[in-house]
Amino acid sequence: MAKPLPKISSRRNGRIGSRKNSRKIPKGVIHVQASFNNTIVTITDVRGRVISWSSAGTCGFRGTRRGTPFAAQTAAGNAIRTVVDQGMQRAEVMIKGPGLGRDAALRAIRRSGILLSFVRDVTPMPHNGCRPPKKRRV
């Protein structure tokens, strides 16, 4: 009977070190999505691959407190802390949405020491596209 050949490389033993810490990212893009209910901060490299992300919900805020500026500031600080350790020095900021956390997240990003090349508002605005939902009657 033939002996089974051992697997040369499987998915489990293929990686020796942690993949997250192996990359040094000098430049990236910080996306801030600020809705009225939550603020999500995603940090990607220039090609668009996600490096780090955080939201007000993952920082422990629940309910209406997720939409506050302080929650947005905490979420931005959490997301940025990991990429500063990986060596990010320059970034572009894309802010989307009408929420209260827009300015607070931007202040937290400025305070982190990352040099911002530009800040762009990418809030989607319809050119009279879809009909909006009917007004609430309370």
Curated annotation (Swiss-Prot):
Q: Spell out the subcellular localization from the entry.
A: Plastid, Chloroplast
Could you list this entry's UniProt keywords, alphabetically sorted: Chloroplast, Plastid, Ribonucleoprotein, Ribosomal protein, RNA-binding, rRNA-binding
Q: Which residues form a coiled coil?
A: none
Annotated region (Disordered), positions in chain: 1-24
Q: Which InterPro entries match?
A: Ribosomal_uS11, Ribosomal_uS11_bac-type, Ribosomal_uS11_CS, Ribosomal_uS11_sf
Q: Which GO terms describe its biological process?
A: translation
Q: From start to end residue, where is composition biased (Basic residues)? A: 9-24
Protein family membership: Belongs to the universal ribosomal protein uS11 family.
This chain's protein is named Small ribosomal subunit protein uS11c
Q: Which organism is it from?
A: Manihot esculenta
Upper lineage is: Eukaryota, Viridiplantae, Streptophyta, Embryophyta, Tracheophyta
